[in-house]
Amino acid sequence: MPERVVRLAEEVGQVTGQTMQGIEQVAKSTKMLALNALIESARAGERGAGFAVVAREVSEVADRARTLSEDLSGELRPRIAELTELGHQLVARVRGQRLADLALNAIEIVDRNLYERSCDVRWWATDAAVVDALAPGAPAAAAAFAGRRLGVILRSYTVYLDLWLADAHGRVVAHGSSTRARDAVGSDVSGQAWFRAAMATRDSDDYAALDVEQHAGLGATTATYATAVREGGRADGRPVGALGAFFDWEHQAQTIVEGVRLTPAERESTRVLLLDRDGLVLAASDRVGVLHERVALCTDGQPSGTYTADGTTVGFALTPGYETYPGLGWYGALVQRH
């Protein structure tokens, strides 16, 4: 609709300009005819005196028509120009707000998705099979059973790449995948960020959300959620190990950025992005620059908004969080070429 208003304003401007030029040309032609008539009436002497009066009147009418045309053109031209400019501004504002709304929708989907991940890991860390596998003196069969239990969970929750269970020393005792990281059991993860963060959680309500990264062991991009497994499964129990849930970030995030509702024409000229707090590209609809490129958003301290830069319109939105998940300071952003 705003684009149609702009087109109409531009068309009115063109038609008005052409019409004013036509009127001015008619006035000039009429003026010339009047002058020629005066010349001929002068040659005719007294017999042309009456015709001379008519010729002068026609000349005056032509002058008035030309003056009116110039006045009308002078009045309309700046107003049509202003209307066109206002239309362009309206189009830019509507387009920008739409992009900002779509950016917010995208980051809200991410938030709701990751909120569920934070709930999953805390719940599974209290599973009896997981707790029993880390109990002092637990037999090897307990760890094997925990692995099978994690496998059952993994088959139902297909958004995860794997689930790893490590003891208090950082040794992986069980994991759920039968196709990935087959050498995970027995490996040392004590130096990995997810394990250290999990062991530092305060109680069973606490969890750690790690930055998106390329996980060497799993051969994929993950967003890891972790928490401590506590003695006896009690909320305030002593940490006896850690559970790490490796979310399939690349596939899930790509589904989100490619699923933003754009028209075919918009999709050709628009890049949908998920960015971390430092502007690092976490996902991109064109799959370019992921975990390498940084985009500097001009937010002016606002949680959402729009602006134009370098021939593009940018709409952005900061993560609002969801329920007990506060978000990680990430942004949704759409960059549309003009």
Where do the language-model regions lie?
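Extracytoplasmic/periplasmic ligand-binding sensor regions of membrane-associated signaling proteins
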Residues: 159, 169, 175-247, 308
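Amphipathic coiled-coil signal-relay and dimerization helices
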Residues: 124, 133, 171-177, 275-286, ...
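Alpha-helical coiled-coil
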Residues: 9-39, 71-81
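Solvent-exposed, extracytoplasmic
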Residues: 145-156, 242-290, 299
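Extracytoplasmic/periplasmic sensory segments of membrane signal-transduction proteins
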Residues: 93-203, 257
